Amino acid sequence: ETIASLDVDLLTKHINQLLDGEEIDVPSYNFITGKREYHGHKLKIGQKDVLVMEGIHGLNGTLTNEIPEDAKYRIYVSALNQINLDEHNRIPSSDGRLLRRIVRDAMTRGNDARETISRWDSVRKGEEDNIFPYQEYADVMFNSSLIYELAVLKQYVEPLLLGVSKDSPEYVEAKRLLKFLDYFVGIGNDNVPTNSLLREFIGGGCFHV
C-alpha cells in the first residue's frame, strides 16, 4: 500500500520510453510469490494513443514527477455507494470496497476472506495516508460504484465469508457482512458486460491485466 514498495525509477523509464514511441517489455507482479515476472507482454503506443495508468498512488506527484505535466491528466476513481437500506440507514461505501476486495483477493491473490478482513484496517489506513490526501490534485472525479454490483458480488462473496472459522477474530465481521448481504437478491453475471468495471473483481473482463 506504500509508494516505497514501487520501482518508481523503472516506471518512469517505461513511461518515457512509451511517450517516445519505443516498445517496452511489461512486467507483472505475482501477488502469490511476491516477485516480478516477465511473460513476453510487449507494449507500444502510437502518436495519438492514450496511455492509461491505474493505481492507488496515481495522484501522488512522487510517482510521476519526472513525467511532463502537459502529458498527464489525473482522474480520481472511487466507489461511492449511493444506495440506502431505508430512510435512516445508508450503505457505507467502505463495505462495498471490502466486498470487492474479498472477491478479488480470493480470485487473484490466493487470500481467503479471513485474511482479507484481517488486513482491512491496514488498507483503510493506507487510504487515509496514500489516497485521500491527493484527491484535490485530480483533474476530474469518477464514481465507479455500480447499482447492480452488490447483487452480483453476493454469489461470489457469500461462500468465502461462510468459510471464515468461528474461532477466528474475523468471524464477527464476516457474520456482519453476511447479514448485510441478506438485504440483496443475488443475480448472475451473464449480463455484466466484459468491459464493466466489476469484471476487475469477478473476472471475465476483456482487458489484459
Name each model feature, range by range.
Residues 33, 43-44, 133:
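Extended, charge-rich C-terminal regions with high alpha-helical propensity
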Residues 50-54, 75-76:
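Structural recognition of the conserved hydrophobic beta-strand(s) that form the central parallel beta-sheet
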